[in-house]
Amino acid sequence: MELVLVGKFLYNGRIIDGSIGVKDGKITKFSLRELKGDNKIKVEKGKIILPGLIDVHVHLRDFNETHKETIETGTKAAVHGGITTVFDMPNTKPPVMDEKTLKMREFLFKKKSYADYALGFLLAGNEPVKADFYKIFMGASTGGIYSKNFEEDYAKALDITSVHAEDYELISKYPERPPIVEISAIKKALNAARKVKKPLHICHVSTREGLKEILEANIPWVSFEVTPHHLFLTRKDYEKSKLLKVYPPLRDESDRRYLWEKLDNVPIIASDHAPHTLEDKERGAAGLPGLETEVALLLDAVNRGMLELWDVVEKMSLNPARIFRIKNKGWGEGKDADFAIVDMKKEWTIKAEEFYTKAGWTPYEGWKVRGKVIMTILRGEIVMEDDEVIGKPRGERIVKEGDD
């Protein structure tokens, strides 16, 4: 073995005391005893080895918006937060809607990314090219481009489609985007899914009724996500600070509680990391940074008994890898040796000044939390230790099932 991690790790829902062997950047063995190896990382008591986490909803800006975020700063933020794979949303400026722009995006990622990555392609009346996933906006959000015919665009997709479900007709009628805007779009998306029968992923579900619609429909090829900001914040927080403007908006306490009630039925948690500078936020930009806080908030919730640590593994590693058909990611022998080592006892205060994102602020400023990512390993190499991102960018594009 080139590398052996020794200590407690999560496996099949249980905490195991043993070791994990790594060779050529891949996991070779999970063992109950201490494996032999050239290089060992001994994980102390109170610390646990998790798989590297996958965030299927990240806006990394760059291109003409390098003042908001770059692939370099955004992926540094990712590994700082224990995220080893990011899904790059294509509503950039310019948007990723043709082969040339997609290739430009890949070129930048190859040079600048500290995390592994999946490349998205935006559909809004254009023809698709091969990408890792497709994104459709049913109503205008950041970037302003949305699909006038969701079903037609979704039917064209060559792989799984992630959809921002807010009804464009209702947005013009209700610009503050009350629950009906999301609920109506989710119903339309589910109706299209029944007809088209292609994999569909509904982003950032925020309402009780929207979630009910998805769960009752129970369509095998439809998945969905919830975000930490919809789990931890409400409309009352937005009323105190207009910086918390986001699409879909923060909801009432009853919606937030319902998301927690149904968390066992939620397959994926994703950040929807959407950085803007404070100046842009003060001018009304919608979106919240989240890559460096999402895992910490969830670890704190684990410590408070709101969910299990295994839930974090399922919703941010196993399920994303399975649903998005990522061949080289997950938690098993032969998968990439990506790890997030967490200290469940570490108490700390969230401060934006300690983060890598260019956003320069966080919705959770001053929150005291218990639980922290202390080391991130990407394909067998340490990329973050004790808040410091280490080495050069070495991110690679994910491998999809069937793409050999």
Curated annotation (Swiss-Prot):
Zn(2+) 1 binds at H57, H59, K135, D272. It catalyses: (S)-dihydroorotate + H2O = N-carbamoyl-L-aspartate + H(+). GO terms for molecular function: allantoinase activity; dihydroorotase activity; zinc ion binding. Pathway: Pyrimidine metabolism; UMP biosynthesis via de novo pathway; (S)-dihydroorotate from bicarbonate: step 3/3. Its EC number is 3.5.2.3. One of its GO terms (cellular component) is cytoplasm. The keyword Coiled coil does not apply. PANTHER family: ALLANTOINASE (PTHR43668:SF2). This is Dihydroorotase.
